[in-house]
C-alpha cells in the first residue's frame, strides 16, 4: 500500500481519501442551507429579494419548505466526497513531496502545496458548483418571476421555457442540456473564476491551518487534539473564506445561467468585475461574506477533525 508521512503518522492514500470524503459529507449536510443563502444573496442585483442570511432562510422555508433549503444538496453530497478527498490528500502529498525532511516548516513550500491542492480539486469543484448554483438560485428566480408577473402580467423575466421548468430544475436535466448544447465546456463554465478563487483560498488556508494546528501539538502524542484541530480548521477556513469572497461573488455570477428581469449577464471575469463595480459599488464584492465564513469554518473544522481522528484508518483495518 502506498503511504506518505504526515507529522508523525503514516497515513495511506486510501485512508486520506476516505477521511476527506466522510468529512465532506458531514460538513455539507450541516451547513448547506447557509450556502444556499450565500448563493442567493450573491446573485441579487438591483432590488433585493432578501435582506440578509436570516431573512433568506426564513423566506425560503416559508415558500419552499424545509427541503427547499437543501436544493442542490444531492449534487454536493455526491461530488463533495471526491472533491474534499482530492483537496486534502493532494495537499498532504505535495507537502510531503516538497518538504522531504519533514521537520522544518517552510511557508513557501506550504503555500505551493496549497496551490497544487487548489488546482487538483477544481476538476470536481467547477462542474459540482455549476450544477449546484442553478438549483440553489431557482427559488430566488421564481420569486423574481412572480414579482415581475404581478407588476407586468405579460412580461417574461428570464429566458424561454415554462415556469415550472425554472421552479423545479434537476441536476440531470441541466447537465444533459449543457452537454447537448455546449459540450463538456458547458459544465466547466467559470473554470477560470473557480481557479482564481480556489487557488488563493488553498494558499491561505493550508499554511494557516498547519501553523495554527502546530501550536496545539502535544509533546507526548506528537499530534494536536481533535478540539484543537477543529478550532484551527474553523479559524483558518473563516479567514480564507472571507479573504476570497470577492472572487467567489464573481464566480457565482458567471456560473449562474438564468437571470431575473434586468439582471446582467457576463462574458468573463473582467467584464463581471467591471459591471459589479460600476453598477453595484465595491460593497457588492463582499456579498455573502458572513455566510461564507459560517459555511467554510465548520466545513473545514469538521474536515480536519475527522482527518486527524483517522476514521479512514479504522475503516481500512476492518477489511484487513
Swiss-Prot record:
Top-level taxon of the source organism: Eukaryota
Keywords noted in UniProt: Membrane, Mitochondrion, Mitochondrion inner membrane, Phosphoprotein, Repeat, Symport, Transmembrane, Transmembrane helix, Transport
GO BP, one annotated term: L-glutamate transmembrane transport
Reaction catalysis annotation: L-glutamate(in) + H(+)(in) = L-glutamate(out) + H(+)(out)
Pfam families (UniProt xref): Mito_carr
A GO term, aspect molecular function: amino acid:proton symporter activity
Membrane topology, as annotated: Multi-pass membrane protein
Membrane-traversing stretches: 17-37, 66-86, 110-128, 190-210, 230-250, 293-313
Any one GO cellular component localisation term in the record: mitochondrial inner membrane
Entry's localization field: Mitochondrion inner membrane
Keyword match Transmembrane: yes
Swiss-Prot/TrEMBL Solcar repeat ranges: 11-97, 105-215, 224-313
Positions of modified residues (Phosphoserine): 150
KW Mitochondrion (keyword) present: yes
Family annotation (PANTHER family): MITOCHONDRIAL 2-OXODICARBOXYLATE CARRIER 1-RELATED, MITOCHONDRIAL GLUTAMATE CARRIER 2
Function: Responsible for the transport of glutamate from the cytosol into the mitochondrial matrix with the concomitant import of a proton (symport system).
Family membership: Belongs to the mitochondrial carrier (TC 2.A.29) family.
Name of this chain's protein: Mitochondrial glutamate carrier 2
Organism, scientific name: Mus musculus
Lineage: Eukaryota, Metazoa, Chordata, Craniata, Vertebrata
Amino acid at each position: 500500500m502506498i503511504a506518505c508521512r504526515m507529522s508523525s503518522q503514516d497515513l495511506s492514500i486510501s485512508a486520506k481519501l476516505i477521511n476527506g470524503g466522510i468529512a465532506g459529507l458531514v460538513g455539507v449536510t450541516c451547513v448547506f442551507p447557509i450556502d444556499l443563502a450565500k448563493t442567493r444573496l450573491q446573485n441579487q442585483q438591483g432590488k433585493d429579494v432578501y435582506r440578509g442570511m436570516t431573512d433568506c432562510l426564513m423566506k425560503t422555508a416559508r415558500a419552499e419548505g424545509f427541503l427547499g433549503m437543501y436544493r442542490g444538496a444531492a449534487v454536493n453530497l455526491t461530488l463533495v466526497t471526491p472533491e474534499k478527498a482530492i483537496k486534502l490528500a493532494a495537499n498532504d502529498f505535495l507537502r510531503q513531496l516538497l518538504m522531504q525532511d519533514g521537520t522544518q516548516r517552510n511557508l513557501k513550500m506550504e503555500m505551493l502545496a496549497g496551490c497544487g491542492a487548489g488546482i487538483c480539486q477544481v476538476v470536481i469543484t467547477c462542474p459540482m458548483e455549476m450544477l449546484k448554483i442553478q438549483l440553489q438560485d431557482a427559488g430566488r428566480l421564481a420569486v423574481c418571476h412572480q414579482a415581475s408577473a404581478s407588476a407586468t402580467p405579460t412580461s417574461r423575466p428570464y429566458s424561454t421555457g415554462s415556469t415550472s421548468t425554472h421552479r423545479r430544475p434537476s441536476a440531470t436535466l441541466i447537465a444533459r442540456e449543457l452537454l447537448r448544447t455546449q459540450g463538456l465546456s458547458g459544465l466547466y463554465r467559470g473554470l477560470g473564476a473557480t481557479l482564481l478563487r480556489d487557488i488563493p483560498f488553498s494558499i491561505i488556508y493550508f499554511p494557516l491551518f498547519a501553523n495554527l494546528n502546530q501550536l496545539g501539538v502535544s509533546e507526548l502524542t506528537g499530534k494536536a487534539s481533535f478540539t484543537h484541530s477543529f478550532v484551527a480548521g474553523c479559524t483558518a477556513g473563516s479567514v480564507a473564506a472571507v479573504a476570497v469572497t470577492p472572487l467567489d461573488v464573481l464566480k457565482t455570477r458567471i456560473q449562474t445561467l438564468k437571470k431575473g428581469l434586468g439582471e446582467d449577464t457576463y462574458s468573463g471575469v473582467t467584464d463581471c468585475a467591471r459591471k459589479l463595480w460600476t453598477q453595484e459599488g465595491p460593497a457588492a464584492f463582499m456579498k455573502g461574506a458572513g455566510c461564507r465564513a459560517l459555511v467554510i469554518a465548520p466545513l473545514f473544522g469538521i474536515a480536519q477533525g475527522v482527518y486527524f481522528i483517522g476514521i479512514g484508518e479504522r475503516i481500512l483495518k476492518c477489511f484487513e
